[in-house]
């Protein structure tokens, strides 16, 4: 997400617990902030046009479910406190429907190592749907995203999982 924003010429402020992990580049400002703290989020994003959140505490995090919900909630609260109106949240494919009334995260084949994070992302989506003071968008990337050459094409769906070969 960061790379795409920079390549498209956006000025980006990245919030990081460890700013030293980022390489200095044009258009990128790295701010030390803990996204679990709404006040720190608010201070970091105040004056921005929009916030793009790709928060995930890490798939290997033992308490990913609770941390994901705490962090996503603090981000929403911080964005609102800062007076930023636009929030784009990068979620996951788990909340997409694969059949009427069946979301991907609820299928038997959903990988166990991603289940708690996907359940938390779905809960975060449920929470943000009740938000009436922000202009928000929840983005669900593909279920499987692998490196490769840009095709210059993409497909948009709504709440259903898109698979290769479907038009």
What are these model-derived regions, one by one?
Residues 20-81:
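NAD(P)H-binding glycine-rich loop region in Rossmannoid oxidoreductase-like domains
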Residues 15, 54, 139:
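The conserved SAM/SAH-binding core of class I Rossmann-like methyltransferase domains
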Residues 11-13, 19, 73-116, 121, ...:
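Conserved Rossmann-fold NAD(P)-dependent oxidoreductase catalytic core, especially the SDR/UDP-sugar
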Residues 1-10:
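N-terminal Rossmann NAD(P)H-binding glycine-rich loop of SDR-like oxidoreductase domains
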Residues 153-167:
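A conserved pocket-lining segment of Rossmann-fold NAD(P)-dependent short-chain dehydrogenase/reductase
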Residues 126-147:
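Conserved beta-loop-beta element that borders a ligand/cofactor-binding pocket
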Residues 60, 94-99, 144-148:
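Conserved catalytic-site region of short-chain dehydrogenase/reductase
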């Amino acid at each position: 997400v960061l790379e795409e924003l920079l390549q498209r010429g956006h000025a980006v402020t990245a919030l990081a617990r460890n700013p030293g992990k980022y390489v200095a580049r044009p258009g990128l400002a790295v701010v030390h902030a803990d996204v679990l703290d709404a006040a720190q989020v608010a201070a970091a994003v105040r004056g921005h046009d929009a916030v793009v959140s790709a928060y995930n505490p890490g798939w290997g995090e033992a308490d990913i479910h609770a941390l994901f919900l705490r962090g996503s909630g603090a981000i929403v609260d911080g964005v609102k406190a800062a007076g930023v109106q636009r929030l784009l949240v990068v979620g996951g494919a788990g909340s997409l429907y694969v059949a009427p009334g069946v979301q991907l995260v609820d299928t038997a084949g959903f990988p166990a190592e991603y289940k708690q994070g996907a359940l938390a992302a779905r809960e975060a989506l449920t929470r943000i749907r009740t938000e009436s003071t922000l202009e928000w968008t929840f983005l669900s990337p593909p279920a499987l995203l692998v490196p490769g050459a840009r095709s210059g094409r993409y497909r948009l769906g709504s709440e259903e999982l898109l698979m290769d070969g479907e038009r």
